[in-house]
Structure formats: C-alpha cells, structure tokens
Amino acid sequence: MTVASAPDSEALDKEAPLRRDIRLLGRILGDTIRSQEGHSVFELVEIVRKTAIRFHRGEEIARSELTEVLAGLSCEGMIPIIRAFSYFSHLANTAEDQHHIRRARLHAIAGSAPRDGTLMLALQRTHKAGIGLAALKEFFTTALICPVLTAHPTEVQRKSTLDREREVATLLAERDRSTSTPEEEVEIDSALRRAILTLWQTSILRRNRLKVIEEVTNGLSYYDYTFLTELPRIYELCQGALATFDPALKDYELPSFFRAEPLRYQFLSRGAPCSGS
C-alpha cells in the first residue's frame, strides 16, 4: 500500500518524518501483500484505497464506484482487503506513536521550555504558586499511585500481533536515531520487512477464547518493557527535576509512592525477593 503525499508547507514540515515512515511501512505492506496474496489482490487493495481517497476528498462519484467494487466481492474475497487496511492502520498508528517520541526528544535536545504534561513544568508552576520545599516533601511522602489493570472486554489483539508492532516501533526508532552505513540501513529495512511479513501471516483474531490465567500471564508479560523499565526512570527524573527546582533537594531520597499488587506478583512469579511496598 502507498500513501498520497500531503501538501508541503512550513506548518507541516515537522510532520515530514511521520509521512516518510508511513510511506515506508505502506510500501513494505504493499510488497508483502503482492508476494503473499498475488498481484490481483494487491491491485484490488490499491483500487479500493485510491477510490476511498477520492471519496474522502469530495468526489461523489467515487462513492458509487467504491460501493460497486466492494459489493462485487465475496466474503472470502473481502478478507484480504479488510486485513490490508486493518494492518495499515496499525502500522500507521505505530509510526505516529514513534513520531510523538521523536518530537519530544527533539524538544529536549533543543532545550525547549518544559511542555504541558511534564514534571518540570509542574514544578515551575508550583514554584510560581509559592509552594515551598516542605509542602513538596509532604506531597511526595503522602502521594500514592496505585494503578488498576484490567483486561479490556473489547481488546482482541493477540500478543503475537502486539509483539510484532513493538518490533516495528523499535526498528523505526533505530532507523531514525542512528547514523547508519548503507549496509546497516539495508539490514534495518530487511528486519522491517520480516516483521511486517510475520504480521501479515498472523491471524488478526484468536480462534480460541483465552482462560483467565492466560489473560493475566499475557498482561504481566508486558511489564518488562513498561512498568519494570519505566518506573526507575520516572523516579530518577523526579529526583533530578526536584534537584533542579531546589538545590536543597539534591540528596533528597524520593519516597516510594507507586504501589501495585500486580507488580509484586510479577516479581514473585520469577522468584525474586519483593517487599510488601
């Protein structure tokens, strides 16, 4: 699949890397569909895509053309079309997530003013509001974050699918950040092609209902690259920001304000020592 170029303007220039990534992923997905399903299926996907774009841009005749194309498909013939657009949407969302990370890094590298939602901006606002050191310490001493994690009743994505999407995200980040040799760029693009091929060969829906313990195990499997990696980073960022806010807090040991029984269960399931906190 390919993506139509967006209008070029100064206001959209910062979105150029996002458009580049989406075009890359769309091109790889299109190549995958052509190699796995045949040229005729690829051409049908392209017809639907281009006609849908025309309809979105206000060409009313495209509506009847699109209806005619889709109405002529059997249920079996519709499946690769649905899968193509579903996976393209997933890949585009992955690229957009990476773009948000990219923009945040660029702001940090440029030394931009703290942005909404950051700890540093919150501390600046507390300082302007006249909140002193004692009040800050009291806040962190009594603060409590206790997430409640549940299996979403409409979440149907398989772990294998989510794992491949995470792999694509990692490869996009590597492609974006590293100064690569031509050979290394080829390796990254080849890895992207393998990940997207695996994604295409993976059924979108589970054929069997998960047991409760399987849902729990699946949920805990994501802790390695969410809570267990990000929590130490968050505490370090908090302590660094507090020291910047007030030098008297340089040696301040931030209290443990994050509690979660699922985290404790994850440690215990590995045989790791874990306190009640």
Language-model regions: role of each:
Residues M1-S277:
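Often metal-dependent polyanion-binding catalytic scaffolds in large enzymes
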